[in-house]
Structures are given as C-alpha cells and as structure tokens.
Amino acid sequence: MRSENVRHLAISEKEKIVGLLSIKDFANYYNFKFCAVINETDRVSRYAEEEILKIDCEATALHAAEIMCDHNVGSILVEKENDIVGIVTERGFSQRVVADGLDANNVKLSSIMNKPVLLDGHLPMDEALSCMRKNNVRHVVVTEDNKISGVISIKDLTIYCKHKFVYELDFGEPI
C-alpha cells in the first residue's frame, strides 16, 4: 500500500475480488491488538509530520490540490490572517468538488474546508486513532503548548504501527 501510495487493496481469491482492505483496517488491527505495548516514547508529536503546509482561505481548490500533489500529502491547513481556520483533505476535495462536478479553479477553500480536529502532541499514539475514529477523520492537527506543531494522518499511524509492532516485536529492536 505504501509503495503504491494507495489506501485500499482489493482482496482476491481464485481471480475473483472477495473484499476490500483499507489502511484504516490495518490501523484498527494494530491499535487494538497491541495498545498495551505503547511506552513513553510513543507520543503523537514524535510521529507527526512537522512540515506544516498552509494556504490562504481565499485560494482555489485547484491551487490547494496542486500543492498537496507536489508535496505528496493528503491535507493542507487553511489560514486567514495567519490564523488556522480549517483543513482541506483529499476526501473533502473529492466529496465537495469532484463529486459535485464543480470547477476546482472557481471553488474557494473557505467553502470546502472542515474545522480541524486538534490533538495534544503529548498524548500516546493510541489516542491518535481514537481521535480519528471519534471524529471520522483521517488527518488530525497536532498541538504542543497550544501551538500547532504538525499533522498526523491515518497513513502515519499505520506506518508507526508497522514499525512498532512488526519490527520491534518480531526482532526485539527499537525503531
């Protein structure tokens, strides 16, 4: 999934598709199977993407999509007068622009953004998935001392789980 940059895999049996596996399925499996193994170093801020992409709320959806593609990310924070006022994600773009047949070059981000979900960076990683599930989102804005310090995605969480529980538990070596 990671090497192909996809979030869903078709499961086949005898050349027939029998199911669909999502990155969210992996995160749920690892989180609830091994949550007792989380230690002090497994804090959200350690694994959050620190490069914070921002764009003005009056920019177009097309411009935001271009920036997200250029940086290979699934979200961008939206600001107004240097304050973060929203977040635009791939899912939001597809649901509010593409599915509605709108021209991305004429859609302002202020009309498609969501209110960002915030999570304290000092919390353990299992709280990140709980927060995502509770709010039905795949991207959470990480804060430290009431300031935005990064963004963590379901993809980041899955990569963390893979390293933590596949490598560390199988080989006894820390990540």
Q: What function would you assign to each model-found segment?
A:
Residues 25, 30-43, 53, 127, ...:
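Juxtadomain coupling helices with adjacent low-complexity linkers
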Residues 6-10, 17-32, 73-77, 84-99, ...:
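Short beta->alpha transition motifs characteristic of CBS
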Residues 24, 62, 91, 110, ...:
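Residues in well-ordered alpha-helical elements
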Residues 1-5, 12-13, 54-72, 79, ...:
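The conserved cystathionine-beta-synthase
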Residues 42-102:
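Conserved small-residue-rich
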Residues 17, 52-55, 84-85, 103, ...:
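Short N-terminal micro-motifs specific to bacterial/archaeal maturation
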Residues 39-52, 106-116:
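Bateman (tandem CBS) regulatory domains
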